[in-house]
């Protein structure tokens, strides 16, 4: 890749958004720096879905929302804006859709194809670059070699698998775990994240940027999901100061130490709707730098 000292408006705005000095993105170390910036800036949140303010998505809309309007989003927005940015520097990067294991019960798989990731081909090797798997973030590309990548949020690896999900041909599995200092002990065991096939590319992104069908399709899958996991209950989560994970729900705010698992929790007054909304918005603004909600949905 040739050095590119002249940056596009989008590139400059993206650098500004993730608080990174403009530079030519040429190596995996450069990509890691971008991933680190994304992890610390973009909130993984579903507030537009909950508030029923979603719109059809394309490159222009996603950039407007996440870069210019300083919003967060779910995987189909955050991973897509990262994809646009890295691709603009000439990287061989493409997207793949995955199936996520239920991260609460770990006893079932969720909607097939409802998570989207980035695959980078660099020096004849493939790497996974996911900046939007909740706060399970590697901060650097993960090689397809079972090499363990460690970040402040945990340890990550990719394993080749067969028949991980019945009747669906997936060939690789992302696994993660917490460090040995983390409590509870069960979190220190390797856990399934999601299954995918790196050869099945999400290639039908409209070249004229009229519609990014994969982002729009996944958004609709989330809205139509009968379990309503991401469509009814407001959620915002992000890494704070590379040491804690902040999680905001309609009922509480929790700060979890990445190394120990120690939690500090603030419970909202659910018996007083006005006060509950005030408490929610206070944290939404101060921790996540997101605009306040007008109401909290009744669940």
From Swiss-Prot:
SUPFAM superfamilies: Cysteine proteinases (SSF54001). The active site is at residues 75, 115, 130. It is an enzyme of class 2 (transferase). Its EC number is 2.3.1.5. InterPro entries: Arylamine_N-AcTrfase, Arylamine_NAT_domain_sf, Papain-like_cys_pep_sf. Keywords: Acyltransferase, Transferase. One of its GO terms (molecular function) is arylamine N-acetyltransferase activity. Pfam families: Acetyltransf_2. Coiled coil: none annotated. It catalyses: an arylamine + acetyl-CoA = an N-acetylarylamine + CoA. Belongs to the arylamine N-acetyltransferase family. This is Probable arylamine N-acetyltransferase 2. It comes from Dictyostelium discoideum (Social amoeba).
């Amino acid at each position: 890749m040739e050095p590119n000292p002249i940056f596009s408006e989008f590139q400059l705005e993206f650098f500004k958004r993730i608080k990174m000095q403009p530079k030519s993105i040429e190596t995996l170390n450069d990509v890691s720096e971008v991933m680190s910036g994304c992890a610390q800036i973009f909130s993984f949140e579903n507030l537009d879905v909950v508030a029923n303010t979603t719109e059809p998505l394309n490159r222009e809309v996603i950039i407007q929302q996440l870069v210019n309007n300083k919003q967060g989003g779910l995987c189909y927005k955050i991973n897509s804006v990262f994809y646009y940015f890295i691709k603009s520097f000439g990287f061989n990067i493409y997207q793949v859709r995955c199936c996520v294991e239920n991260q609460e019960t770990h006893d079932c798989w969720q909607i097939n194809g409802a998570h989207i990731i980035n695959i980078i081909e660099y020096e004849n090797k493939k790497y996974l670059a996911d900046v939007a798997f909740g706060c399970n973030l590697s901060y650097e590309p993960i090689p397809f070699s079972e090499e363990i990548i460690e970040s402040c949020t945990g340890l990550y690896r990719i394993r080749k698998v067969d028949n991980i999900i019945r009747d669906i041909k997936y060939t690789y599995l992302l696994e993660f775990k917490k460090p040995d200092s983390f409590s509870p002990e069960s979190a220190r065991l390797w856990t399934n994240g999601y299954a995918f096939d790196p050869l099945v590319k999400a290639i039908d992104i409209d070249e004229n940027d009229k519609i990014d069908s994969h982002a729009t399709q996944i958004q609709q899958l989330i809205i139509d999901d009968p379990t309503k996991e991401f469509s009814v209950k407001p959620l915002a989560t992000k890494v704070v100061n590379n040491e804690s994970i902040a999680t905001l729900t309609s009922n509480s705010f929790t700060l979890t130490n990445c190394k120990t698992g120690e939690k500090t929790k603030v419970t909202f007054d659910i018996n007083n709707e006005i006060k509950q909304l005030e408490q929610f918005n206070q944290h939404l603004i101060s921790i996540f730098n997101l605009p306040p909600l007008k109401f909290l949905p009744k669940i």
